[in-house]
Amino acid sequence: MIPMQHSLTQGPITKNILLFALPLMFGNLLQQMYNIADTWVVGRFLGADALAAVGSSYTLMTFLTSILLGLCMGSGAAVSMQYGSGETEKMRQSVFQSFLLIAGIALVLNLLVYLGLNGILWLLRVPAELCSLMKDYLLIIFLGIAATFLYNYFANLLRAIGNSVVPLAFLAVSAILNVILDLVCVLVLDWGVKGAAGATVFSQYVSGVGIGLYTLKKFPQLCPKRTDCRWDRKNLANILNLSVMTSVQQSIMNFGILMVQGLVNSFGTVIMAAFAAAVKIDSFAYMPVQDFGNAFSTYVAQNYGAGQPDRIKKGIRSAGLTSAMFCIVISMLVCAFAAPLMGIFIDPAQTEIIAAGVQYLRIEGACYIGIGVLFLLYGYYRAVNQPGMSVILTIASLGTRVALAYLLSATPLGVTGIWLSVPIGWALADAIGIGYYLKKRT
């Protein structure tokens, strides 16, 4: 049985990280179901144009929510350090300050995307025939930004104190509800892409509001008292350092992907549809190592706060080996079953779309160990209060990816050049991150 709450400062290292990571993995699995359900229903029942529109919308939404996710992850890292060092009062103060800060940013972000939607679609070079579909989908899906903030904020708070089970439970209910509502809204009510978007937004509010109310009732140690509701400049500076830098790292990562999406869109509907389906499979495939990296980050943060550097070093060795094993297995599975996986989302008769997606998956899939290492590096530098290093690694990875994608796609390689740019970017960032770590040790 997986315990509800972990102290990662004692006990078996690998076992504890894995036990903490498992609910994160299941939770991310369910999170992926939101978009996979949309992709499957839209791709199978509404056609390639609708799939291309929803796929491009997903890339945009991932960028926007990454800003909030980074802020929530950063505030969670601050809380985790204070939890590890036993600073309960300061921890509650961090909850008060970070909640108001991120809630305000979420409201501003929501307003900006509504006002600038037409300009955003133009920048993404969305084909004219898809603009109406994308606009219909996005105008509804943007309503879920507040729900995304609520869920990610409270989920990261609970994970900071070692509880990864409760976020999983709320996400499970929400994901199942989303699948049911997707089928009802698209197949029964015939609401098209608007129905798929509405199903997702409603389900997001179920998980966001639900986990917020549950946390406030069941975890009093995280609920600010009246005396905690004040602005402490030093504590706020620490929260801002971790939150803003983590948000910058997350948003740079997804802005780079957004730029690549714009390039992909220029190749037409076939490549857009292939990319939309393949990215879902790709994200799903490396999800275990991403969540393992987040679990490792909490492990490092708690031990960093508790002043246990030797235990951190042992955890690095253990996490590196475990992540490598994950990646090898996942790489073999994706490369072997790329075509059947594409067939989940695309009608087998659309062979051109499937062929493009298979090529993408086999190039990326063969190199998953690169992103596995990168997720560990992101988690480590965030946990030891060096989020700026995570930003540098992200710029190296995504900068390389975007630059090479535009350069190589203009050669006879064409769209293959876009696919090849990804693992090259991972490798460069890994080399920088490992080199910096080794230099600091000497």
Q: Where in this protein do the model-derived segments appear?
A:
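Short alpha-helical transmembrane segments in multi-pass integral membrane proteins
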Residues: 1-21, 79-144, 188-244, 300-367, ...
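N-terminal transmembrane alpha-helices
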Residues: 8-45, 59-74, 78, 103-110, ...
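Transmembrane helical elements of multi-pass membrane transporters/channels
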Residues: 19-38, 140, 151, 174, ...
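Helix-terminus/linker motif at the lipid-water interface of multi-pass membrane proteins
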Residues: 29, 33-52, 121-128, 184-191, ...
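Small-residue hotspots at the loop-to-helix junctions and early N-terminal turns
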Residues: 48-59, 138, 197, 269-284, ...
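Small-residue-rich hydrophobic transmembrane alpha-helices
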Residues: 51-111, 148-167, 274-338, 371-393
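Hydrophobic transmembrane alpha-helices of multi-pass small-molecule transporters
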Residues: 63-66, 178-182, 208-212, 284-287, ...
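Short runs within selected transmembrane alpha-helices of multi-pass transporters and secretion channels
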Residues: 72, 141-159, 167-175, 196-211, ...
